[in-house]
Regions:
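Short histidine/acidic/glycine/proline-rich micro-motifs that form metal-
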Residues: 11-14, 39-43, 70-71, 151-154, ...
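Histidine-acidic metal/acid-base catalytic patches
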Residues: 1-11, 17-28, 99-101, 158-180, ...
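Structural motif corresponding to the early beta-alpha repeats
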Residues: 33, 37-128, 236, 240-248
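Active-site acidic/histidine proton-transfer and metal-coordination neighborhood
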Residues: 78-177, 259-262
Length: 275
């Protein structure tokens, strides 16, 4: 495997501040090439010291973001949709300051918001319109949108590869592309490798997560099959490891499936390189 390997900083919780700079140093020492940096603070000035530190450590970076109930992009309320769009535009501004050419995540709709029904044609239209305008802003900043689908328990707009492809087709913008997260795919897809092959050259980012959100190789996800599929489509971009702990309340993690963060960091990269 020749892809660069990254680590998602959400393992340490949602407080993404300079106290994590020592963690960045440990991640670099463990052999990682980059990190996923969650953009929750949408003040661009917040990310200037982050760019400096990542440049100092020669760590690549991918910006990721998530929207909560207050920024629901497919709300029936036009003011809410506008608010969500403006918030995501600010996330793009922060990604640019950070030095990332990609904004990844499920920001097509709000996490954990449901209506009791599948998405309507009107909601699908709102999503595509919102994302097209966001992609236009991303184009001005030389950033690509990497859209992620979530599983059925976290999102009702898109929860599988086919639905995500349909949404991105509807957006129809070169700066709006696809990403893959093995945690959600493990729940929703019949075959993980086939899902990746279906994404093909539109796949711009990959997150590898174990079925229990713990150390890679300690669960039942077939990562060898995933890596084979990535080779089949000539995927050469970063592969990020995503694991969560009880520090991330939104993920509903009630027990940690690892000894400590650095055990997970070290064992996961060693496992991935051994496949």
């Amino acid at each position: 495997m020749t892809n660069k390997i990254g680590m998602n900083l959400l393992l340490w919780g949602t407080e993404i501040n300079t106290s994590l700079f020592s963690v960045l140093e440990q991640i670099k020492a463990a052999g990682y090439d980059g990190v996923e940096v969650p953009i929750f603070d949408t003040n661009p000035d917040h990310w200037k010291p982050w760019r400096e530190k990542l440049d100092e450590l020669e760590l690549d970076r991918v910006a990721v973001t998530i929207n909560g109930p207050d920024h629901h992009q497919i709300s029936a309320d036009p003011s809410m949709r506008h608010k969500a769009l403006e918030r995501n535009k600010m996330a793009l501004e922060c990604a640019q300051v950070l030095g990332s050419s990609l904004l990844a995540g499920p920001y097509h709709s709000a996490l954990g918001v449901f209506t009791g029904s599948k998405s309507s044609e009107e909601e699908n239209k709102w999503a595509a319109e919102n994302l097209f305008e966001l992609a236009e802003h991303a184009k001005d900043l030389n950033i690509t949108l990497g859209l992620e689908y979530l599983n059925r328990f976290e999102s009702y707009l898109v929860s599988c590869t086919d639905e995500l492809i349909a949404l991105v087709d509807r957006v129809n913008h070169p700066n709006c592309q696809l990403m893959f997260d093995s945690f959600h795919a493990n729940i929703e897809e019949t075959n993980l490798g086939d899902a990746i092959r279906k994404m093909g050259n539109r796949l711009v980012h990959v997150q590898l997560s174990e079925n229990h959100r713990g150390t890679l190789g300690a669960g039942h996800v077939d990562f060898k099959d995933i890596l084979t599929a990535l080779e089949d489509i000539n995927y050469h971009s970063m592969i990020s490891i995503e694991a969560f702990s009880s520090k991330l309340s939104a993920a509903n993690i009630w027990r940690n499936m690892f000894d400590d963060e650095m055990q997970l960091v070290n064992d996961s990269i060693q496992y991935l390189k051994s496949i």
